[in-house]
């Protein structure tokens, strides 16, 4: 897998560069993760669980979460990596749902999601040669 082209592709496709990556990383980690948890867990899981079956709410919100994220990475990797990513993100969605089912709020999964984004953004800092 060629990681060297990812930074260039991010710059060309999304305007993300070493000059603005710190701000992008902070936004992704704090704001975007909250918005995602609000939608995928607060709406698509907790609210949906009240009007449908528990199993449907688990699967629907987890798969929706995975498709949203995998869609952002389409074109960066081959199909095998894409499929593994889709599976891993679905499992992550199920885990986030489980965390929120216990607390009946989105704050637990938001915290975990934030730390996952910190880890992913660390890779971004490396790819952009910032650390």
Where is each model-derived feature located?
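Short juxtamembrane and helix-loop transition motifs at transmembrane-helix boundaries
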Residues: 15-24, 44, 69-77
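Residue-level hotspots within the lipid-embedded alpha helices of multi-pass solute transporters
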Residues: 29-34, 66, 85-89
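Active-site His/Glu-centered metal-binding helix of metallohydrolases
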Residues: 34-39, 43-44, 67, 71, ...
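Small-polar-interrupted transmembrane alpha-helices in polytopic inner-membrane proteins
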Residues: 57-70
């Amino acid at each position: 897998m060629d990681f060297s082209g990812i930074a260039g592709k991010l710059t060309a496709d999304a305007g993300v560069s070493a000059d603005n990556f710190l701000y992008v990383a902070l936004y992704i980690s704090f704001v975007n993760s909250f918005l995602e948890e609000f939608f995928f867990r607060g709406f698509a899981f907790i609210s949906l669980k009240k009007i449908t079956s528990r199993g449907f709410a688990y699967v629907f919100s987890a798969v929706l979460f995975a498709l949203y994220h995998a869609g952002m990475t389409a074109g960066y990797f081959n199909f095998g990596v894409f499929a593994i990513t889709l599976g891993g993100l679905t499992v992550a969605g199920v885990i986030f749902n489980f965390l929120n089912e216990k607390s009946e709020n989105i704050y637990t999964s938001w915290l975990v999601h934030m730390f996952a984004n910190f880890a992913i953004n660390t890779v971004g800092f490396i790819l952009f040669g910032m650390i």
